[in-house]
C-alpha cells in the first residue's frame, strides 16, 4: 500500500491511500449487481427532483441488506473508520461531541457523464432517522480525469475524485458544496453522514 496522506484545511479532511483499489472495485461491483435486480433508486423519481438539480442512481444499505454490505465492504469501512477517528481527534470534534456521533445508512451513488447534484447545498438537516447530521463523508470509488469534483463555494476548493480518496467535512453552513458533473466517465462514490444523537 502507498503511504497514507492527510490534508485537513478549513475542517475539510482529505485522506488518500487508506482504502485499497480492490476494496473500491468490490463496492462498484456491489452497486452494479444490485442495479441488475432493480434495487437501485433514481433520485429524480424518488425525491421528485428536477433533472437540473439531481440526477444519479443510488443504492442504500438498510436493514434488509445490511449483511450483504458488511460481508462485501467490511475492510473498506474499517479503513475508513481509521481516517474518521483521525479526523475527529485532530479537529477537536471528538471532545466537542463527547462520543455522541454514530453512523447512519450508507449509500453508493453512480453518476453518469454530465449528471450529478448541481445545486449548491448544505447537509445540515435531519436525516432519514430524524437525527441531526454533524459530518458528511464521501469515498471516491474510481478516478475521474475531468469533472466530478466536490466543490466548496466559500473555500474556493475543488476535490478531485481519486480511487480510495476519503473526504470528510462538517454538514452545516458555511460548507455549501455541490457535486460537479463528471465529464470523462462514470463516477462512483460511497457517501453518508455522521449523526448526532
Predicted feature locations:
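Fe(II)/2-oxoglutarate oxygenase catalytic core
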Residues: 1-166, 174-197
Amino acid at each position: 500500500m502507498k503511504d497514507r496522506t492527510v490534508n485537513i484545511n478549513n475542517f475539510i479532511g482529505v485522506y488518500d491511500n487508506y482504502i485499497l483499489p480492490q476494496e473500491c472495485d468490490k463496492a462498484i461491483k456491489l452497486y452494479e449487481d444490485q442495479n441488475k435486480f432493480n434495487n437501485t433508486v433514481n433520485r429524480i423519481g424518488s425525491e421528485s427532483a428536477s433533472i437540473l438539480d439531481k440526477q444519479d442512481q443510488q443504492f442504500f444499505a438498510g436493514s434488509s441488506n445490511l449483511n450483504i454490505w458488511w460481508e462485501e465492504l467490511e475492510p473498506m469501512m474499517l479503513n475508513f473508520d481509521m481516517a474518521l477517528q483521525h479526523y475527529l481527534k485532530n479537529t477537536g470534534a471528538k471532545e466537542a461531541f463527547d462520543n455522541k456521533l454514530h453512523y447512519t445508512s450508507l449509500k453508493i451513488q453512480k453518476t453518469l457523464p454530465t449528471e450529478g447534484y448541481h445545486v449548491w447545498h448544505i447537509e445540515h438537516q435531519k436525516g432519514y432517522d430524524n437525527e441531526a447530521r454533524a459530518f458528511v463523508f464521501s469515498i471516491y470509488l474510481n478516478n475521474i480525469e475531468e469533472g466530478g469534483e466536490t466543490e466548496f463555494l466559500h473555500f474556493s476548493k475543488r476535490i478531485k475524485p481519486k480511487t480510495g480518496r476519503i473526504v470528510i467535512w462538517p454538514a452545516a453552513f458555511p460548507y455549501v458544496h455541490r457535486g460537479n458533473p463528471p465529464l470523462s466517465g462514470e463516477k462512483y462514490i460511497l457517501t453518508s453522514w455522521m449523526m448526532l444523537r
